[in-house]
Amino acid sequence: METKTPSVSIPSADDLVEIKRPTSLLIAQFFLFPLIIIAICVGIFLLFGYLTYEQKSPQEYLNDVRTGSELCCRWQSAYELSNIISSQKAKIRNTDFVNDLIKVYQNSREGDPRVRRYLALTMGHLGDPRAVPALIEGLNDNDSENQMNNLLALGTIADKSATPAIIQHLTSNNPAVRKMSAFVLSAIKDPAAARDLEIALNDTNDEVRWYAAIALAQIGNASGANVLMRLIDHNYLEQLQGFTLEQKSQLMINAVKCLGLLKFEPAKDRILALSQTDSDLAVRDASLEALKNY
């Protein structure tokens, strides 16, 4: 028996209608999907790169500083070393790394000043008192930024043997160096600096006076208490130019802490008011802690 195939009528060309894809689908097909594929490939590449990446050791970075190219490598290696050293201190505590670092620092007077700056910070982060003589010597550099990095490193180590050298920089022609010197003395807390800090209370630079007052409070000296009282006055802080709200807040917090440390009676009522009504919660917390000293 013959099977009949049902006939299907085919429309004429004029009756055919083109089915158009949405524009968004075309964009996805030609642009978005390829971008997704590329992003996945890049992600896989970065993942494998991260898995196979091995960070250099402090000694390797130091070797790069010692032997690297002046144009591109030495200061970058010194920078990386300053960033990783804090997490590596335990591993190198009983090695000669500190002595090697000091030698490289002492031999870095010529060339890119950034090398010396970052090596100074590295010695500070390391916190080893053996680096103090080299850092004191570095205070004589003509580069003011390196002077400040050396001061900061000495403050981090906080060895009182550095006090006389730091005091000398309270009279620097550069106000930034004077400010850093006063700040560092607040960290070292050496009563031997009291007389020079009292003189610094009359400095022409506001910040030098502030940090001198803070440093004096750290050694129990109330000579700068009136300077600190101004820093817990919102009207005074609001008039300061060139400071962010966060910086002004930190100034007030430091002043509150120092006045509490001194148990300075004229400040008690004002600190009490700050603890109850100040809009800055950090100032309130600092005030509550300071009141515990009275």
Question: What are these model-derived regions, one by one?
Answer:
Residues 273-289:
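C-terminal/domain-terminus segments
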Residues 51-65, 87-108, 128-140, 159-171, ...:
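Amphipathic alpha-helical scaffolding segments comprising HEAT/armadillo-like alpha-solenoid repeats
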Residues 20-31:
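Short, low-complexity patches enriched in S/T/P/G
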Residues 1-20:
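N-terminal intrinsically disordered, acidic low-complexity segments at the extreme N-terminus
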Residues 69-70, 109-112, 142-143, 173-174, ...:
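Short inter-helical turns and helix N-cap capping residues of alpha-solenoid HEAT/ARM repeat scaffolds
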Residues 44-53, 72-90, 113-128, 137, ...:
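Structural detector for internal amphipathic alpha-helices that build alpha-solenoid repeat scaffolds
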Residues 29-50:
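Hydrophobic membrane-insertion alpha-helices, especially the h-region
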Residues 104-107, 147, 282-283:
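Short, mixed-charge aromatic SLiMs
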